């Protein structure tokens, strides 16, 4: 299966999503903000970056820009609970697979990850 980096500042949600993806057979790693996520991306190769948009230190938009520039083959899937953040992600359309709206049900995020990995 895939090696996935879950970057989310809400620890309960981050652990919940990572655990669900592990149950699907994926190898997951977790980061609490964009800067930590970028460090982890530099240290290891991942198949998918699943990141919240609104985070401290470095937000998911900046993380996605830098990740796409440094790791061209990386698939990027963003998550947000804020409509205005989704609009901010529009300029990333060529660099990301999709934006998943929070709150989401577990089948929704699993489906989004499967679709992202299939592309």
Residues covered by each model-derived region:
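Conserved acidic carboxylate
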Residues: 8
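Acidic phosphotransfer microenvironment of two-component signaling modules
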Residues: 11, 32-36, 107
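Two-component/phosphorelay signaling modules centered on CheY-like receiver
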Residues: 11-29, 116
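Acidic, metal-coordinating helix/loop segments flanking the phosphotransfer/catalytic sites
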Residues: 29-48, 69
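Acidic catalytic/metal-coordinating carboxylates
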Residues: 33-36, 59-63
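Active-site residues of response regulator receiver
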Residues: 52, 80
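Receiver (REC) domain active-site loop signature in two-component systems and cognate sites
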Residues: 55
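Alpha4 helix (beta4-alpha4-beta5 surface) of REC/receiver domains from two-component response regulators
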Residues: 62, 75, 82-100, 107, ...
């Amino acid at each position: 299966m895939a090696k996935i980096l879950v970057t989310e500042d809400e620890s309960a949600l981050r652990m919940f999503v990572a655990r669900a993806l592990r149950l699907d057979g994926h190898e997951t790693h977790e980061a609490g903000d964009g800067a930590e996520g970028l460090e982890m991306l530099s240290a290891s190769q991942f198949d998918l970056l699943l990141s919240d948009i609104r985070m401290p230190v470095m937000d998911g938009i900046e993380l996605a820009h830098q990740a796409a520039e440094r790791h061209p083959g990386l698939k990027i899937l963003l998550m947000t609970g804020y409509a205005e953040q989704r609009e901010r992600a529009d300029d990333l359309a060529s660099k990301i697979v999709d934006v998943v709206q929070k709150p989401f049900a577990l089948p929704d995020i699993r489906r989004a990850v499967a679709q992202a990995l299939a592309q």
